[in-house]
Amino acid sequence: MTTVASLSLLPHLLIKPSFRCCSRKGVGRYGGIKVYAVLGDDGADYAKNNAWEALFHVDDPGPRVPIAKGKFLDVNQALEVVRFDIQYCDWRARQDLLTIMVLHNKVVEVLNPLAREFKSIGTLRKELAELQEELAKAHNQVHLSETRVSSALDKLAQMETLVNDRLLQDGGSSASTAECTSLAPSTSSASRVVNKKPPRRSLNVSGPVQPYNPSLKNFWYPVAFSSDLKDDTMVPIDCFEEQWVIFRGKDGRPGCVMNTCAHRACPLHLGSVNEGRIQCPYHGWEYSTDGKCEKMPSTKMLNVRIRSLPCFEQEGMVWIWPGNDPPKSTIPSLLPPSGFTIHAEIVMELPVEHGLLLDNLLDLAHAPFTHTSTFAKGWSVPSLVKFLTPSSGLQGYWDPYPIDMEFRPPCMVLSTIGISKPGKLEGKSTKQCSTHLHQLHICLPSSRNKTRLLYRMSLDFAPWIKHVPFMHILWSHFAEKVLNEDLRLVLGQQERMINGANVWNWPVSYDKLGIRYRLWRDAIERGVDRLPFSNQSESGS
């Protein structure tokens, strides 16, 4: 019989633990006190061979505080203090549960019809009175345990604040700090620390958006879906506050050139594609995919060239390298996992800085409050939301939601959502769900106040939906509706940020992935030799 099932058989009155125990020193893992027996009033050994005692036995961890080598405890030592507190609470809870079992056995014995035949009413009253006294003690013990748990939660909340502060101060470059972050538990008691003096914060995202650091350009950026680039079409894009246009050359391969004619600075995308060359609509000058002007009607041919960027196509996506000296390394795949079918590819131009949009996409805790008319309609508000991730990673999974998420530098967010029941996501992990939705968000930094968003949605079920007429219009409408729910908030953030407000003023546990993105970006802009959070953050990978 399981513990839960056993407890369900106990009278409600008895679930208030306490007992008198006789203990002797034993050799435990922590050198504490090992409980060997529980004695009744008559000295009978109830627990020496009791299955309950064997099940819930645990060493007393005892009060232990790590020795500080300096004037103050560092983060690791502080976490050790909390860990020992948690171990003691666990030991105390097991002892309380053992008390419940012992009292249960006593009640069964007192009320046993066979035993009552050999006892007088006075004896039964006396035994019941003694049990009532023990229950009163158990009631007091429960309150004491609740106080201990509350104190432990307060310490956990303070440790969370301490770890976040240390993580922000260290800039994410220290592996030990990152490890501390993964160990920092998240509790609903975080609000209890607001009356304490707030620690100094070093993650400051406030003020007008500054010009982009050139280091951010040294990555491959996906800028368009292949399906949007026909042989006779052009795709104008902005990237890092420069205007470019993408088109296919004579060989069918995509090219990216400056969207400005060398002659009179006319936008080239207003023209047309003629035999694999982009033609200016003003005077008909034509440029190849490498930027060379190959045709000048009505004048003598001159050696003219406009800027071009390295550009290639992979797995239905067009990529460019806006920085210097592109590497020869291959680009990781952005395709959905095996078994998924792509149902929608949508492009939007949004009036927000791309970092703020990434902050939003890397945060799921806002969903039941923000997306109440779309995908999160009907979601309950969990008592605790956590993002569980390796100490040095940019990926993990949300608890209690069945959602896996990854930030992939420089600007991609990939997520897999397990679908169990419509309108309900809690209760299962992603792997436990039989059907899934896979999402890819690409946030291309168009300018300091504009983002080009590429969105791809895939399903591992119902592939026939893709062939339903006008289904792409429905997907686009739904995606736009979801984004509008976010935009009204992110635009407000952006306005206040420009006026001096810090959009990362008080990070909490479920902000972990967003914090790591910001620390990664800060490291890129500072030009550190070793980027934080795994090898996938290497430039150009």
Curated annotation (Swiss-Prot):
Cite the EC number.
1.14.13.122
Q: Which catalysed reactions does the entry list for this protein?
A: chlorophyllide a + 2 NADPH + 2 O2 + 2 H(+) = chlorophyllide b + 2 NADP(+) + 3 H2O
Q: Which residues form the Rieske domain?
A: 220-320
UniProt subcellular location: Plastid, Chloroplast membrane; Plastid, Chloroplast thylakoid membrane
Spans traversing the lipid bilayer: none
What does the entry list as the binding residues for Fe cation? D359, D363, H366, H371
Kindly indicate whether the keyword Transferase belongs to this entry.
no
Biological process terms from the Gene Ontology for this record are: chlorophyll biosynthetic process
Record membrane topology: Peripheral membrane protein
* InterPro entries, alphabetized: Cholesterol_7-desaturase, PaO, Rieske_2Fe-2S, Rieske_2Fe-2S_sf, Ring-hydroxy_dOase_2Fe2S_BS
Positions in coiled-coil regions: 114-151
* Comment field on protein domains: Consists of three domains A, B and C. The C-terminal C domain possesses catalytic function while the N-terminal A domain confers protein instability in response to chlorophyll b accumulation.
Protein name, please?
Answer: Chlorophyllide a oxygenase, chloroplastic
User: What gene is it encoded by?
Assistant: CAO
